[in-house]
């Protein structure tokens, strides 16, 4: 017991008698505050000179009394759950073994190593405890009682981990996933880098089917060739595209060179009698054994599924591209227009107002445009003679063709033209009128044609007569939106949304000034109101709407009503209220208010009316009907002014 720590009754520094500790050299008795100060200042012991670095305290440990209870230690890695009594969760602990079965002693011994399952009643939180330590390990629980510890033997130590609510992969499944990830993520990239660095000779060049004599059975597959790089360079240079260049280099490594001749398209997309059904031939010795990969996991070329993708036949060109090539050949043979000539023709057509027919006939082929070129040039000559010169119009060359007065030999399928003896002129003008209501550009063009036709000969004026109606409507549809037009639209349809109203005048709301004027008119004459379906729509502020009729009559009636309606109503006077009360003796409050309801709109009007009523009238109960009526307070003969007004009325 000589080595035991002997503490004095008080601290040597401050004299405190509570919370005492001994120094590491066991010579000094210090409280916690003085010991912390000496450790921070690196003070030394007064007797031995040892620097004070820590404080110690000794306890007696005794064995616990024998009991039948078994104790276990549980360690929670992710944090201790809420085990308080007041918590809402109720926890249960069980072994991960089948329930309700009888086990032998040997089976029970094996089941001791099974993990514990700790879960709450909701099943949301679940922990699994695994046995920690070896079978011969011994654990004790140190529980402090008074000033000594009690050592309680514990059976086992369990580490509890939270059970994941998602599916967990096994070790084999995880390895397979990582292998596929490496193969698809960077294996293909590394293989491509290796092929690019070493060139096509890495896998060996093969002969083209054409040079090998078109032998059957091999399906276009040849043998290794030392001079195959020149042909590959020729194919790449013919394409001139980066993507196709990569594709060509890849196919050259696999022995699948594409034929460069365009006159053998009938034989298939690749040319020749290539048989792609023979998988054994396609996956032959040249591909599998010429290149030896050092890394088996990242040998992308050894994957049979990926080899099938690489050996797949080339997708044929779309029919549109093939059609364009045929058209170019036909143009060269027949001496038609080139691409620059077509672009010039389109620009001339747009300048002469022919872009309408271009939009309607976008799906026509180039061959039809070539056959109708003479007719189109004739119509452009006539329309150019009718129109006045415009500053921003480009200079138009005069193409050769028949004279202006003679009709063309063939009618154009893709272009519209006005003829002198055309019997279908009114119907075409109606269709054009319907289009011009939604197309401001076409309306401006027709208006310009109409003004020019008035100064020409009578026969030309008859030609442009069907276009006069859309021209007049287009002239009215230009400029800022007026208040009358907005009123007419709101009266046509009771429930008009803001989006529908804006779409009506979208063509005329181009500038910022037009939009601001439109918004100001809307705030002035309309308001937002909700219907039964909680949808907002725009309505006029006036309650009564005119009867349906023509647009002009509606606007005129609306203007008359707005002019007749007084701008500001006068206040109700005392003489007027007296006059009403004397006309009818038994008048209720509601009836009196209804007489002047139209003039009681503002708070000022209502306050003045109430003040006059309190001054000259009072409520009196009618004995016959048990109702309160309004009567004058003086209940005398009316004033002379009142009698005079009554006689006049």
From Swiss-Prot:
One of its GO terms (cellular component) is nucleus. Heterodimer of an alpha and a beta subunit. Interacts with CPL3 and CPL4. The gene is RAP74. Residues 396-410 have a biased composition (Pro residues). TFIIF is a general transcription initiation factor that binds to RNA polymerase II and helps to recruit it to the initiation complex in collaboration with TFIIB. It promotes transcription elongation. This is Transcription initiation factor IIF subunit alpha. GO terms for biological process: positive regulation of transcription elongation by RNA polymerase II; transcription initiation at RNA polymerase II promoter. Residues 380-389, 434-449 have a biased composition (Basic and acidic residues). Residues 466-477 have a biased composition (Low complexity). PANTHER family: GENERAL TRANSCRIPTION FACTOR IIF SUBUNIT 1, TFIIF-ALPHA. Residues 466-543 are annotated as: Required for CPL3 and CPL4 binding. It comes from Arabidopsis thaliana (Mouse-ear cress). Pfam families: TFIIF_alpha. Residues 450-459 have a biased composition (Polar residues). Residues 201-480 are annotated as: Disordered. Keywords: DNA-binding, Nucleus, Transcription, Transcription regulation. Belongs to the TFIIF alpha subunit family. It is found in: Nucleus. Residues 229-247, 274-283, 293-308, 323-335, 355-371 have a biased composition (Acidic residues).
